[in-house]
Amino acid sequence: MNETSHLFLAKRENNPLRENILVNTRQCKHFPGDPERSIALMEELGRKLGQDGRADKTTVVIAFAETATAIGAVVSGFFHDCFFVTTTREKLPDWATAIGFEEQHSHAPQHYLCVRDEDAFRRAAQVILVDDEFTTGRTAMNLIRALDGCLA
């Protein structure tokens, strides 16, 4: 089995903005897979991201909804002083500090990040963005710009 045989494009329905989706069978997302192997890969990612002393730095891990939330949760466990948060497509309550950003290619383009502890972001030495796929990086850049505008 070659290194990319677990990847394939699938046809999407009901999304005129994005005709295909990249499916990674090792993620157990959109396609059945081996959960033990999937979790082991998430743990490997967490270990790699925490190398060279990075695991000891104050960290914010942000996982993109909905499909990267499990990956982000596992990754965040490898950082000693970590604040973990996920984005959401749901409208947040009025008491929440919500940072809005867009995922242009999505069927539901408006996303939010609920920031309950702004100081966690200000204290962080590093912020790690976790998604199930980065194709253009546009969504990540949209979030970074929104964070910079709200938490600077």
Q: What do the PLM-derived regions correspond to, one by one?
A:
Residues M1-A152:
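PRPP-associated nucleotide enzymes
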